[in-house]
């Protein structure tokens, strides 16, 4: 194998080319590759964080939904209890009002009955006096006396 000047010149040119590439071309390429790798890694990390945040948000939403349902059920239960209480109070009030009205009606009936009895007594007394006067006026005749007593009994 012959070593001539061309081979040495080509070797020197190749070494200069390699040195030039290593000094000026290779570092920007490596920086671009490293920067791209870093952006990809950051993007993947952000995606992982987003997935974790999404799961956390779903978990919180589920917990809040459960809490809201529990609160709603509690409010509904309290409303039902209050409804039952109001109904019971209304029934008790209605029963008391009914008893009051019945007692008042009975008292009015009793008062009216007593008034009617008193009027009847007065009328009976008046009739008895009138009957006695007529009997005394006709006391001579027993048939008339019997007739007046029968009329008086019929009127009473």
Curated annotation (Swiss-Prot):
Gene3D superfamilies from the xrefs? F1F0 ATP synthase subunit B, membrane domain
Keyword Nucleotide-binding part of the UniProt annotation? no
Keywords on record: ATP synthesis, Cell inner membrane, Cell membrane, CF(0), Hydrogen ion transport, Ion transport, Membrane, Transmembrane, Transmembrane helix, Transport
Where it sits in the cell: the answer is: Cell inner membrane
Q: State any GO CC term.
A: proton-transporting ATP synthase complex
Q: Does the keyword Cell membrane apply?
A: yes
Topology versus the membrane, per the UniProt entry?
Answer: Single-pass membrane protein
Q: Which GO terms describe its molecular function?
A: proton-transporting ATP synthase activity, rotational mechanism; proton-transporting ATPase activity, rotational mechanism
The UniProt entry, under InterPro entries, shows:
ATP_synth_B-like_membr_sf, ATP_synth_b/b'su_bac/chlpt, ATP_synth_F0_bsu_bac, ATP_synthase_B_chain
- Transmembrane region positions? 7-29
Q: What is its main location?
A: membrane
Self-association and partners? F-type ATPases have 2 components, F(1) - the catalytic core - and F(0) - the membrane proton channel. F(1) has five subunits: alpha(3), beta(3), gamma(1), delta(1), epsilon(1). F(0) has three main subunits: a(1), b(2) and c(10-14). The alpha and beta chains form an alternating ring which encloses part of the gamma chain. F(1) is attached to F(0) by a central stalk formed by the gamma and epsilon chains, while a peripheral stalk is formed by the delta and b chains.
Family membership, please give it.
Belongs to the ATPase B chain family.
Q: What does this protein do?
A: F(1)F(0) ATP synthase produces ATP from ADP in the presence of a proton or sodium gradient. F-type ATPases consist of two structural domains, F(1) containing the extramembraneous catalytic core and F(0) containing the membrane proton channel, linked together by a central stalk and a peripheral stalk. During catalysis, ATP synthesis in the catalytic domain of F(1) is coupled via a rotary mechanism of the central stalk subunits to proton translocation.
Stated name of the protein? ATP synthase subunit b
Source species of the chain = Shewanella denitrificans (strain OS217 / ATCC BAA-1090 / DSM 15013)
């Amino acid at each position: 194998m012959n070593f001539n000047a061309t081979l040495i010149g080509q070797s020197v040119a190749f070494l200069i080319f390699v040195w030039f590439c290593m000094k000026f071309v290779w570092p920007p390429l490596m920086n671009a590759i490293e920067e791209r790798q870093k952006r990809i890694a950051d993007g993947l990390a952000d995606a992982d964080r987003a997935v974790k945040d999404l799961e956390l948000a779903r978990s919180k939403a589920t917990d809040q939904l459960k809490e809201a349902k529990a609160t709603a059920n509690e409010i509904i239960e309290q409303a039902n209890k209050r409804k039952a209480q109001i109904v019971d109070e209304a029934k008790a009030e209605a029963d008391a009002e009914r008893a009051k009205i019945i007692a008042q009606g009975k008292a009015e009936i009793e008062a009216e009955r007593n008034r009617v009895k008193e009027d009847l007594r007065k009328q009976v007394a008046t009739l008895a006096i009138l009957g006695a006067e007529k009997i005394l006026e006709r006391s001579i005749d027993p048939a008339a006396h019997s007739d007046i007593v029968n009329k008086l009994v019929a009127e009473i």
